[in-house]
UniProtKB/Swiss-Prot annotation:
The glycine cleavage system is composed of four proteins: P, T, L and H. Keywords: Lipoyl. This is Glycine cleavage system H protein. Binds 1 lipoyl cofactor covalently. InterPro entries: 2-oxoA_DH_lipoyl-BS, Biotin_lipoyl, GCV_H, GCV_H/Fam206, GCV_H_sub, Single_hybrid_motif.
């Protein structure tokens, strides 16, 4: 079973969300998702300043197996991207919940995060795949 940290919230589309304070949330893809994709070769990140709505495809993770869209788990504005991924996309594989984060969003409504899955809910959604 994949590592599913209990302090994060999850979208059914395998993105995780971590609060950073002041309505800013870090977003990445779960260990389960990176395991399905395999070794990352390129990550196409959104632009800082992009306004996104929940469910928008705003990022692409390309692996040796496939290219997969990454969706905005919450609405808001992209305020930072993980530029380390340009040279080291494999960080998504080696540390998906740490150095492999993708981008940060300033939420339009921070309460939207409460509608995402907790660790148990996300684990159940994986089990149903």
């Amino acid at each position: 079973m994949s590592n599913i940290p209990t302090d994060l919230r999850y979208a059914a589309t395998h993105e995780w969300v971590r609060p950073e304070g002041d309505g800013v949330f870090t977003v990445g893809i779960s260990e389960h998702a990176q395991g399905l994709l395999g070794d990352m070769v390129f990550v196409e990140l959104p632009d800082v300043g992009d306004a996104v709505s929940t469910g928008d495809d705003i990022c692409v993770a390309e692996s040796v197996k496939a290219a997969s869209d990454v969706y905005a788990p919450i609405s808001g504005e992209v305020v930072e991207v993980n530029e380390d991924l340009e040279d080291s996309p494999e960080l998504v594989n080696s540390d998906p919940y740490g150095d492999g984060w993708l981008f940060k969003i300033k939420a339009d409504d921070a309460a939207e995060v409460e509608g995402l899955l907790d660790a148990e809910g996300y684990e159940n959604s994986i089990d149903e795949e």
